UniProtKB/Swiss-Prot annotation:
InterPro entries: Ribosomal_bL17, Ribosomal_bL17_CS, Ribosomal_bL17_sf. It comes from Streptococcus uberis (strain ATCC BAA-854 / 0140J). The lineage of its organism: Bacteria, Bacillati, Bacillota, Bacilli, Lactobacillales. The keyword Transport does not apply. Keywords: Ribonucleoprotein, Ribosomal protein. GO terms for biological process: translation. This is Large ribosomal subunit protein bL17. GO terms for molecular function: structural constituent of ribosome. The keyword Amino-acid biosynthesis does not apply. HAMAP family: Ribosomal_bL17. It holds the Pfam family Ribosomal_L17. The gene is rplQ.
Amino acid sequence: MAYRKLGRTSSQRKAMLRDLTTDLLINESIVTTEARAKEIRKTVEKMITLGKRGDLHARRQAAAFVRNEIASENYDEATDKYTSTSALQKLFNEIAPRYAERNGGYTRILKTEPRRGDAAPMAIIELV
């Protein structure tokens, strides 16, 4: 089998992977279980590769997977308005150019101590 089931149905698993991938793109580092970290590594690598391509088709493919969440919000005093950046905009405008010269290997998984409640192996996954 080429993927982990993670104890969920396929729709639940896909939703969880979309959420974790979006969170990683926004925060650039998250703490999760080791199995989930290894699984979202695949999707994050694909999204960054799409971001590096940068064409319209790649943008639409990434938009179909990444959640429409606000990555950052800034206040402009001159115009008295808030400007927000979505996770998709951050992927294409900030993250992808950072890895323009890198061929894969955009994430790093660091193992940490087990979770206190159930001793599940935990890991920190972050963008390199």
